[in-house]
Regions:
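Alpha-helical interface subdomain recognition
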Residues: 1-94, 98, 115-120, 127-131, ...
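Helix-loop "lid/cap" segments that line or gate small-molecule binding pockets
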Residues: 106-115
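A short core secondary-structure module
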Residues: 160-161, 165-209
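Glycine-rich phosphate/pyrophosphate-binding beta-alpha loops
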Residues: 169-174, 218, 255-259
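Long, acidic (Asp/Glu-rich), low-complexity accessory segments flanking structured domains
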Residues: 226, 230-248
Length: 364
């Protein structure tokens, strides 16, 4: 019986079928960018609680931001979401999940692509593609959580401005963000039909950022409380139509869920690979841990479950590229992938013993 375990998650990539040569070339380029520019400074940013802003402009200069933004605005000009998925995979695989490019690319940019006027596109898309503008979206409130229809932040029309009042919390990219898409209530007679999306820009009077929230993980992902006190937001900063914000928010959910699923599979695969390397080297009771039957069963089960989950998520990715991914199927992918990640990482951590609890070991 062999005393080593092959835990390579990379070895299955050629068999997946969802990516082509152009995608893999893009993957290699982005992987090099992470290894040379992001990973070396990541521990510092984790301690400081925020990613250095120049990482966004560097990502933009290499073509890793706004891949779906038209070329005339400095973007990649491709609506192929597989490029976005590669970024989500590689960020997660490299263990730099706090690098907020997925939020910028997959969650924020689509609102500008789908609902911005021509004037707004000229005003904001070039900066979003270059990284000069970092985006965030503010939905969650202290008293509403994920109940979007219960949003209490208000925006009252006053001439050619909306007067915005309210507060948001748990806003990712909240410290770095230059522009924030704020979900606010412009009509009070309908829970679902009275929301609108306003773009609040850095420096607007009455727009304040609270503390950078101290979390148990993803420390470099700046997460802030935001407050709005009589902020005068120009009508020209309304995204889409007034009162249709809830519909806009819900329409992007499948893609947001898919991004999380893709990242979760990559994180689980990386945990399996790291753990396989560890048990091959670590000796206990006179032989490598990899020679213990329980270890082999545990690694094999984690690897199989991750690859099965990956197959389902890849299917969802292909459906999304074809415009056929439903909200419920995307929710299934998110649920399956995150629960698998939880099980796999826990099993891997147990095999590392006390070292699994040490921050210097990536599995932790």
């Amino acid at each position: 019986m062999a005393s080593t375990i092959n835990g390579s998650a990379r070895s299955v990539a050629p068999e997946r079928g969802v990516y082509g040569p152009d995608h893999e070339a893009f993957r290699d380029s982005f992987r090099r960018f992470l290894a040379t520019r992001v990973v070396p400074g990541y521990e510092t940013w984790e301690r400081e609680g925020v990613i250095a802003r120049e990482m966004f402009t560097e990502a933009g200069s290499h073509g890793f931001l706004g891949m779906a933004i038209p070329e005339e605005f400095g973007g990649g000009g491709s609506d192929d979401f597989r490029f976005n998925a590669i970024i989500a995979e590689e960020v997660s695989y490299a263990g730099v999940m706090s690098f907020g490019v997925n939020l910028h690319n997959d969650i924020c940019v689509p609102y500008f692509l789908h609902y911005a006027t021509d004037e707004q596109r000229h005003r904001w898309l070039p900066g979003l593609a270059s990284g000069e503008l970092i985006a965030a979206i503010a939905m969650t409130e202290p008293g509403t959580g994920s109940d979007l229809a219960g949003i209490a932040t208000t925006a009252v029309l006053d001439g050619d401005h909306y007067v915005l009042n309210g507060s948001k919390t748990f806003i990712s990219n909240g410290i770095n963000a230059d522009i924030v898409i704020v979900a606010a209530r412009t009509e009070s007679d309908s829970r679902h039909g009275g929301l609108s999306l306003l773009v609040v820009e850095r420096g607007m009077e009455g727009f304040e950022r609270g503390r950078n929230l101290d979390k148990i993980g993803m420390h470099a992902q700046d997460t802030a409380e935001l407050s709005f006190t009589d902020v005068r937001v120009p009508v020209a900063n309304l995204l889409g139509e007034s009162g249709r914000g809830f519909r806009y928010l819900v329409s992007n959910l499948p893609q947001e869920r898919l991004t999380i699923a893709v990242a979760s599979v990559a994180a689980a695969a990386r945990a399996v690979e790291l753990t396989a390397d560890y048990v091959n080297e670590r000796k206990a009771f006179g032989k490598p841990l990899a020679a213990q039957q329980n270890t082999r069963f545990t690694i094999a089960d984690a690897h199989v479950q991750t690859e099965v989950t990956r197959a389902f998520v890849d299917n969802c990715l292909a459906l999304h590229v074809d415009g056929a991914l439903s909200a419920d199927r995307a929710a299934m992918a998110k649920l399956a992938a995150t629960e698998n990640q939880d099980r796999v990482v826990d099993a891997c951590l147990q095999l590392l013993g006390g070292y699994g609890y040490m921050a210097e070991y990536p599995v932790s």
